[in-house]
């Protein structure tokens, strides 16, 4: 784990020196990993179409949280705009997050962060406690389904988001037969 820095980090300087660290398919770099939370810089464009489900996020600032949800994942868009695709109330929904805006995503919400070219954001998540499970889901977007239909789901304990997601996403991208929807037989796009 990274120790707490002894001096402030000037993010613009860090970014100028490290932007090459933000590479596909996930495009993230861990800026800080403490006992309670992880702070990541994330760049665009990313090359993924999975929906991440994080069951561990707990809101520490109740005034920011909706009454319906006390679990959160924090997004702050530093440069450019992004799109956060979610599955909410058994339907797909797109949430634009513009430059300078922040958004708190309820925990256990399937979400796909779509990051465009030359965009930068910060994402904060809680550390995963022992026994917690993250999920990567891929949904069929080609068939005529009444509700979101999962093609594939990978369940794992996440200890390092930057290294664990990449091989799972790459396996999805390379396995055409594994991208076939069992209900409609359509093959999902790799990215």
Curated annotation (Swiss-Prot):
Keywords: Cytoplasm, Dioxygenase, Iron, Metal-binding, Oxidoreductase, Pyridine nucleotide biosynthesis. It catalyses: 3-hydroxyanthranilate + O2 = (2Z,4Z)-2-amino-3-carboxymuconate 6-semialdehyde. GO terms for cellular component: cytoplasm. The keyword Metal-binding applies. Pathway: Cofactor biosynthesis; NAD(+) biosynthesis; quinolinate from L-kynurenine: step 3/3. One of its GO terms (molecular function) is 3-hydroxyanthranilate 3,4-dioxygenase activity. It is found in: Cytoplasm. Coiled coil: none annotated. O2 binds at residue 48. Its EC number is 1.13.11.6. GO terms for biological process: 'de novo' NAD biosynthetic process from L-tryptophan; anthranilate metabolic process; L-tryptophan catabolic process; quinolinate biosynthetic process. The keyword Cytoplasm applies. Pfam families: 3-HAO. Catalyzes the oxidative ring opening of 3-hydroxyanthranilate to 2-amino-3-carboxymuconate semialdehyde, which spontaneously cyclizes to quinolinate. Belongs to the 3-HAO family. This is 3-hydroxyanthranilate 3,4-dioxygenase 2. It comes from Aspergillus clavatus (strain ATCC 1007 / CBS 513.65 / DSM 816 / NCTC 3887 / NRRL 1 / QM 1276 / 107). The lineage of its organism: Eukaryota, Fungi, Dikarya, Ascomycota, Pezizomycotina.
């Amino acid at each position: 784990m990274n120790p707490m820095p002894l001096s402030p980090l000037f993010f613009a300087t860090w970014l100028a020196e490290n932007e090459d660290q933000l590479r596909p398919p996930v495009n993230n770099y861990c800026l800080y990993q403490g006992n309670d939370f992880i702070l990541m810089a994330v760049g665009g464009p990313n090359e993924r179409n999975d929906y991440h489900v994080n069951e561990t996020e707990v809101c520490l600032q109740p005034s920011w949280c909706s009454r319906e949800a006390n679990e959160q994942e924090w997004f702050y868009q530093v440069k450019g705009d992004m799109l956060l695709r979610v599955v909410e109330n058994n339907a797909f929904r797109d949430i634009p997050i513009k430059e300078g805006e922040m958004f708190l995503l309820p925990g256990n919400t399937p979400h796909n962060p779509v990051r465009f070219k030359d965009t930068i954001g910060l994402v904060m998540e809680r550390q995963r406690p022992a026994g917690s499970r993250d999920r990567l889901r891929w949904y069929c977007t080609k068939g005529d389904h009444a509700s979101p239909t999962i093609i594939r789901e990978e369940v794992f304990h996440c200890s390092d988001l930057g290294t664990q997601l990449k091989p799972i996403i790459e396996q999805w991208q390379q396995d055409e037969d594994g991208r076939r929807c069992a209900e409609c037989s359509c093959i999902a796009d790799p990215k």
